[in-house]
């Protein structure tokens, strides 16, 4: 199309109809329990051609494997790019965060005998968790993508209800997590320096460095509110802004060298990781703000997945796209990255987390 080679990402009633459309989309994309850990089959051919306008630096694409940790992978990737764009180099461990979050939930479950152990969450949770438990770098603390965190969580749940003493439980829990995830050490060694995990986390993410945004009309714009989605387990508040303002925040950050963490719905048939493209098959005919609110209230837009926005691009027709780094490995035409249309982001965004420096 116009002789442009396909861009490669550098390494580094109406409601009834909508419900029917969503049901078909779910069946077609085989979306099941795993949520953000589910890889979908390609639903479109790879024929789109893109021109990259802005591409930020990134660490290598990771694979979250059998886990619901997309929120941790995406938020850590955002922090990694932030440092790379400043000339620093960090590659951060989602598995460290997973272990600490499992330990926290396991201790609570042992005492209360209530609840479950789960790794579902939202991007702001990552900031809270590393502020409490610290962080390690990827080379020192990671498991392979075959580790099934759903199985690990079930083992921990059974152990917590097994009639052990607290000391026995702590010892057995540590042994289980050492074996199934990775052994924790009290020091982080990085580029000749030695940190505690908390010191390392504070060097990576400063207090108030990021702000979370959303865009829904059941709360007033210009004010924060606690977003009513099941995975908002820490009851985080998100600044509510019009959707056009939210997209402008993304574009402005990317143009100034800051990545953005994106969270939203991926159950539309136009979202296809294996072809590396996400578009809306049916663009809303009315006001986007009203349409996205209607889909949210009817549970047609849900909190499915989290990824890192790292660039701006356009297709052969001049339509704008965001370049997004996923955490499902590199098995697609863009080596694990995707081109996601701005229209898709406008319609299907649940929230973003962006740098506060602008």
Regions found by a protein language model. Give the residues of each.
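N-terminal amphipathic/basic-hydrophobic helices that include classical n-h-c signal peptides
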Residues: 1-19
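Sec-dependent signal peptide recognition
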Residues: 21-26
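C-terminal motif of bacterial Sec signal peptides marking the signal peptidase cleavage site
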Residues: 34-35
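Short, low-complexity, disordered segments immediately C-terminal to signal peptides
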Residues: 39-47
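Active-site signature of cysteine proteases
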Residues: 39-40, 54, 59, 174-358
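Active-site nucleophile-adjacent alpha helix/oxyanion-hole segment immediately C-terminal to the catalytic cysteine
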Residues: 46-195, 208, 213-218, 251-256, ...
């Amino acid at each position: 199309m116009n002789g442009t080679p396909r861009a490669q990402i550098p390494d580094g009633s109406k409601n009834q109809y909508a419900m029917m459309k969503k049901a078909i989309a779910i069946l077609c994309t085989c979306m099941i329990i795993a949520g953000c850990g589910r890889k979908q089959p390609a639903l479109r051919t790879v024929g789109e051609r893109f021109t990259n306008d802005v591409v930020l630096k990134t660490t290598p694409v990771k694979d979250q494997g059998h886990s619901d940790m997309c929120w941790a992978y995406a938020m850590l990737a955002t922090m990694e790019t932030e440092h790379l764009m400043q000339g620093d180099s960090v590659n951060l461990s989602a598995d460290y965060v997973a272990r600490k979050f499992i330990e926290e939930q396991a201790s609570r479950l042992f005492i209360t005998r209530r609840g479950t152990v789960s790794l579902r969450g939202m991007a702001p949770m990552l900031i809270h968790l590393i502020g409490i438990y610290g962080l390690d770098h990827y080379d020192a603390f990671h498991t392979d993508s075959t580790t099934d965190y759903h199985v690990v969580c079930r083992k921990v749940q059974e152990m917590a209800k097994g009639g052990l003493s607290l000391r026995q439980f702590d010892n057995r829990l540590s042994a289980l997590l050492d074996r199934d995830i990775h052994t924790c050490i009290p020091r982080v060694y990085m580029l000749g320096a030695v940190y505690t995990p908390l010191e390392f986390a504070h060097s990576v993410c400063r207090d108030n460095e990021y702000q979370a945004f959303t865009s829904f009309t059941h709360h007033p714009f210009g004010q924060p509110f606690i977003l009513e989605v099941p995975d908002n387990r820490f009851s985080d508040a998100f600044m509510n802004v019009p959707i056009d303002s939210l997209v402008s925040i993304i574009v402005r950050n990317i143009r100034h060298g800051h990545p953005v963490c994106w969270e939203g719905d991926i159950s539309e048939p136009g979202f296809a990781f294996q072809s590396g493209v996400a578009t809306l098959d049916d663009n809303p005919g009315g006001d986007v703000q009203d349409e996205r609110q209607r889909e949210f209230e009817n549970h047609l837009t849900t909190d499915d997945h989290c990824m890192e926005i790292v660039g701006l691009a356009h297709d052969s027709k001049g339509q704008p796209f965001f370049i997004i780094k996923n955490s499902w490995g590199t098995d697609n035409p863009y080596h694990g990255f995707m081109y996601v249309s701005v229209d898709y982001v406008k319609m299907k965004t649940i929230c973003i987390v962006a740098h506060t420096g602008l």
